[in-house]
A protein has these predicted regions:
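Bacterial Sec-dependent N-terminal signal peptides
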Residues: 1-26
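Short glycine/proline- and aromatic-enriched beta-strand/turn motifs that initiate or cap beta-hairpins
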Residues: 19-77
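Flexible, solvent-exposed coil segments and beta strand-coil junctions
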Residues: 32-41, 91-102, 183-192, 233-236
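Short loop/turn motifs that connect adjacent beta-strands in outer-membrane beta-barrel proteins
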Residues: 36-42, 64-71, 108, 124-135, ...
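Residues that define the transmembrane beta-barrel architecture of outer-membrane proteins
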Residues: 40-44, 51-55, 69-71, 110-114, ...
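Residues on the lipid-exposed face of transmembrane beta-strands in outer-membrane beta-barrel proteins
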Residues: 48, 57-63, 116-122, 141-145, ...
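Outer-membrane beta-barrel translocator/channel fold
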Residues: 77-115, 119-121, 125-129
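Outer-membrane beta-barrel transmembrane domain signature
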Residues: 140-225, 230-242, 246, 259-261
Length: 263
């Protein structure tokens, strides 16, 4: 009985010590959900581009076929300029009906284009890490609608040595060619909206090839820079200049930035 009592006293002491020991609370580990490896089906993005002969902006919709191949369509609005366009300062100072604006000497029309393209993306190198860069080859082609808008100037008519002069806003024609191309008769550029309702359509086609670099931080984001070659062609020569050769085909290098998301 004495041995049993001693054993019970020892067990009671162990239990008492065990009750005073508080088990360590496991530390919480917070980790941002990782989307790496998630299968995406489509992309939506918008962007802007600068060409060696103009600028534009666009919307892109892409369907992901598999990991290395995609197909897309995009619609774009851009402005194309002639390589001989040079901004000229008016020879007149303040004192007329408006402050003179600089103008492009010899320019007779502006060209704006709405294009629809479809194409394919070939992924050349996938991102190996979250901070990596994906490189792709994009090729596309489509149709264009060129809008040729008259470039209007404010011209001076009459004897400039007297007050017997008249200011007229006019577009280029065979009747006013001598005045339109006389810098001493050009007072100012008339403004961007002048000639808007006199635009004429010019059908055409477009094609593009470029390398795209996507370095977005997360897989569901798109942050892409693309560089490449763009070619726009029209049914007829586009009359942009009166003092230089006009063209039917407009090749140009371009760089674009595109932002969007995948889902």
């Amino acid at each position: 009985m004495r041995k049993i009592a001693i054993i019970l006293l020892l067990l009671a002491g162990v239990c008492a010590n065990a009750q005073t020991v508080v088990p360590a609370k496991p530390q919480k580990i917070y980790k941002k959900q990782d989307n790496k490896g998630i299968l995406y089906f489509e992309e939506s993005s918008f962007g802007a581009l600068y060409k060696t002969n103009g600028w534009g902006f666009f919307y892109n919709k892409t369907k992901i076929i598999h990991a290395t191949k995609k197909k897309f369509w995009e619609i774009e609005f851009n402005k194309t300029k002639h390589e001989k366009e040079t901004k000229t300062e008016s020879v007149f100072t303040q004192g007329g009906p408006i402050t003179p604006k600089n103008y492009y000497y010899g320019k007779i029309n502006s060209l704006y284009t709405i294009s629809y393209r479809k194409g394919y993306t070939k992924v050349l190198t996938e991102k190996s890490l979250r901070s990596g860069v994906e490189i792709s080859l994009n090729t596309s082609y489509g149709v264009s609608l060129g809008l040729v808008k008259p470039y209007e100037l404010m011209l001076i008519y009459g004897d400039q040595t007297t007050d017997n002069i008249t200011f007229k806003t006019e577009k280029y024609s065979s009747l006013n060619a001598s005045t339109f191309l006389d810098q001493n008769s050009i007072y100012s550029y008339a403004g961007t909206w002048q000639g808007f309702f006199d635009m004429k359509p010019m059908p055409g086609a477009t094609a593009r090839i470029g390398l795209a670099f996507d370095w977005a931080t997360f897989d569901d984001n798109i942050t892409t820079m693309e560089i490449g070659l763009n070619v726009d062609g029209y049914l007829l020569n586009v009359p942009l200049m009166a003092v230089a050769k006009n063209h039917q085909v407009f090749p140009a290098m371009y760089v674009s930035m595109r932002f969007g998301n995948r889902k």
